[in-house]
């Protein structure tokens, strides 16, 4: 695994915090409930006596980040930044693989499509309280999807399917997928986004 990308601003922020701690203290980056929909990433102080033999050390300009053995694969492609805005500054930690372990490029098509749905598409739909589930991939190359949450019964579901999800899947899996189809029995209700 490559080193977690920590921006210069975030490194400076960590250095300021670490300067107020006991000498030899570094940071720990971790995932609670990795590989589940409830996965949460975090950063904490890591005093010298808290380093485990199985930890991976990632060295930066003025400190190290330690990652435990279980969290490590779920932090692949993670990025940490320190963003300053009008209302203040905040640390952002993006870990696209925290909820689902990255699949190999040569994994079966079903697994690769499921990975994209869980790490790229569902996080976008979650803003509207929605999600999709991959039911199957047909022999003729169609991803059969079921919409849930705020997407179920939403009047914009056809646009979301064709202009959003299908376009994204076809661009990522050219020649492997022919399209996406919805098998949801839509029932409009208060849960529907539009």
UniProtKB/Swiss-Prot annotation:
Its cofactor is [4Fe-4S] cluster. The keyword Metal-binding applies. Binds 1 [4Fe-4S] cluster per subunit. The cluster is presumably bound at the interface of two monomers. One of its GO terms (molecular function) is iron ion binding. One of its GO terms (biological process) is protein maturation. Keywords: 4Fe-4S, Iron, Iron-sulfur, Metal-binding. It holds the Pfam family NifU. The keyword Metal-binding applies. [4Fe-4S] cluster binds at residues 151, 154. PANTHER family: FE_S BIOGENESIS PROTEIN NFUA (PTHR11178:SF51), IRON-SULFUR CLUSTER SCAFFOLD PROTEIN NFU-RELATED (PTHR11178). Belongs to the NfuA family. HAMAP family: Fe_S_biogen_NfuA. Involved in iron-sulfur cluster biogenesis. Binds a 4Fe-4S cluster, can transfer this cluster to apoproteins, and thereby intervenes in the maturation of Fe/S proteins. Could also act as a scaffold/chaperone for damaged Fe/S proteins. Homodimer. This is Fe/S biogenesis protein NfuA. It comes from Pasteurella multocida (strain Pm70).
